[in-house]
């Protein structure tokens, strides 16, 4: 292998010394429900338009909506599967993305506060979001799709680690 060979590792987004915790698979159902909330009325409108128009080419619109729904149904499980977090000694890592990967490193000492959110749909699916707030908005992070007990545990752990790191300043 030459020095200009393309590396096969995902090192910047998947450090080898880290044990990732995945988010709950229930996030898939929540995201697909939101997609269906928008796609079903759009499909009904496209079908009504195609029926009323009486032109064969207009059926391309309902077909496009169906294809979009199938693509979302294929994509969402993969997106959720790529999401995770890892707690290290001095920071929290949060990763997401398939094509456009992202990994945010949040130092415990930079955290100002941590909160847990769960809207009606999230509660129905038994998931919550942990939001980490820092002084710089770019270093904050959110972890969606956590079971409520794990979200509360992570919130308390991050808050206590943040206080311990700030006390050392």
Model region roles, listed by residue range:
Residues 1-169:
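N-terminal basic, Ser/Thr-rich segments that initiate or prime the first beta/alpha elements at protein or domain
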